[in-house]
Amino acid sequence: MPQKKHNRVRSAKVLRKTSETDISVEVDLDGSGSSTVDSGVTFLDHMLTNFSKHSGIDIALRCKGDTGIDDHHSVEDIAIVMGSAILEALGDKKGIHRYGWAIIPMDEALARCSLDLGGRSYCVFHAPFSRAEINGFSTEMVEHFFVSLSRTLQANLHLRVLEGSNTHHKIEALFKAFAYAMKQAVHIIGTDIPSTKGMI
């Protein structure tokens, strides 16, 4: 799907520093899918690199977090900042497709994502995982990542694993489905606000 030519700059950089994390996220919605990701959580780096590659959104992300405790604060705060950065880069959302969906396989796993960038924050997530963690990444944080991101992105997000047994494959399929849904949703197809309300 070639990106519609436009003269807008759809990029943003957001910083967040708390007693638990120090995060910088920079995104370019009209990028080439290049990324530099250092989250402090290796498996999350892998997922976010995949998201960047398959969404076409350039990402530069750095996080220094209290991973000596666990990964919760880093994963949650990265999602918060990523959502904020993408929302800022979207600007007034004129001409965007707004909606996106994808069903993506990863070997035996199959995941579906549907999203709406219409300004209404809601996340529905269904994905059972047989493993509690992968290389220091708590699998319960997958849902929390998407819930946190949907809030600051102001997006309605539905994610579901339809098939699968391997936890790694199921999570990767979810992130790739999200990537392709996002690629479609941010794609510019016109010049109007995609809502009868006149704003989103």
From Swiss-Prot:
Lineage per the UniProt record: Bacteria, Pseudomonadati, Chlorobiota, Chlorobiia, Chlorobiales
Gene for this chain: hisB
Ranges in coiled-coil conformation: none
Compartment(s) of residence: Cytoplasm
Top enzyme category: lyase
Keyword annotations: Amino-acid biosynthesis, Cytoplasm, Histidine biosynthesis, Lyase
Reaction(s) this enzyme catalyzes, per UniProt: D-erythro-1-(imidazol-4-yl)glycerol 3-phosphate = 3-(imidazol-4-yl)-2-oxopropyl phosphate + H2O
HAMAP family: HisB
Pathway of action: Amino-acid biosynthesis; L-histidine biosynthesis; L-histidine from 5-phospho-alpha-D-ribose 1-diphosphate: step 6/9
InterPro entries: IGPD_sf (IPR038494), ImidazoleglycerolP_deHydtase (IPR000807), ImidazoleglycerP_deHydtase_CS (IPR020565), Ribosomal_Su5_D2-typ_SF (IPR020568)
Organism: Chlorobium phaeobacteroides (strain BS1)
One GO molecular-function entry: imidazoleglycerol-phosphate dehydratase activity
The EC number(s) this enzyme carries: 4.2.1.19
One Pfam family recorded for the sequence: IGPD
Protein name (record): Imidazoleglycerol-phosphate dehydratase
Family (UniProt): Belongs to the imidazoleglycerol-phosphate dehydratase family.
Single GO cellular component term: cytoplasm
GO biological process, one term: L-histidine biosynthetic process
